[in-house]
């Protein structure tokens, strides 16, 4: 299925649904989904546009089996606030 949207000429909805909006033909085999990467303008919706790292996020939680409850959600500051 082809549709012209921006620079892309392929329709590859990702792993959530197949080209018909269903899930019956996915991952059969798993490598079949990788063929969508061959299009030069292909970019999956699951890839983030930006990446933020928080090096101190896991401080004090050295043993993940015991300390996983210490890990908290990270809420970045909004732009312009200090």
UniProtKB/Swiss-Prot annotation:
Gene Ontology cellular-component terms listed: periplasmic space
Residues with PTM Tryptophylquinone: 43
GO molecular function: oxidoreductase activity, acting on the CH-NH2 group of donors
Cofactor binding note: Contains 1 cysteine tryptophylquinone per subunit.
Site of covalent link 3-cysteinyl-aspartic acid (Cys-Asp): 27-33, 41-49
InterPro entries: QH-AmDH_gsu_dom, QH-AmDH_gsu_sf, QHNDH_gamma
Secreted in keyword set: no
EC number: 1.4.2.-
Active-site residues annotated for this sequence: 33 (proton acceptor)
Annotated catalysed reactions: 2 Fe(III)-[cytochrome c550] + an aliphatic amine + H2O = 2 Fe(II)-[cytochrome c550] + an aldehyde + NH4(+) + 2 H(+)
Principal location class: periplasm
PTM per Swiss-Prot/TrEMBL: The cysteine tryptophylquinone (CTQ) is generated by oxidation of the indole ring of a tryptophan residue to form tryptophylquinone, followed by covalent cross-linking with a cysteine residue.
Activity modulation: Inhibited by carbonyl reagents such as hydrazine, hydroxylamine, phenylhydrazine and semicarbazide.
UniProt-annotated location(s): Periplasm
Induction context: Induced by growth on methylamine, n-butylamine or benzylamine.
Cross-link named 4'-cysteinyl-tryptophylquinone (Cys-Trp), sites: 37-43
Cofactors (names): cysteine tryptophylquinone residue
Cited Pfam families: QH-AmDH_gamma
Keywords: CTQ, Electron transport, Oxidoreductase, Periplasm, Thioether bond, Transport
Cross-link (4-cysteinyl-glutamic acid (Cys-Glu)): 7-16
Homology family: Belongs to the quinohemoprotein amine dehydrogenase subunit gamma family.
Role of this protein: Catalyzes the oxidative deamination of a wide range of primary aliphatic and aromatic amines. The physiological electron acceptor is the constitutive cytochrome c550.
Record text on subunit structure and interactions: Heterotrimer of an alpha, a beta and a gamma subunit.
NCBIfam families on file: QH_gamma
Protein name: Quinohemoprotein amine dehydrogenase subunit gamma
């Amino acid at each position: 299925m082809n549709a012209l949207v921006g620079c892309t000429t392929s329709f590859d909805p990702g792993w959530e649904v197949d080209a018909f909006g269903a899930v019956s033909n996915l991952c059969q085999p798993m490598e079949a989904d990788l063929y969508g990467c061959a299009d030069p303008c292909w970019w999956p919706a699951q890839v983030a546009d930006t990446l933020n790292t928080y090096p101190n996020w896991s401080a004090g939680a050295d043993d993940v089996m015991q300390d996983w409850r210490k890990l908290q959600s990270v809420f970045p500051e909004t732009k312009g606030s200090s």
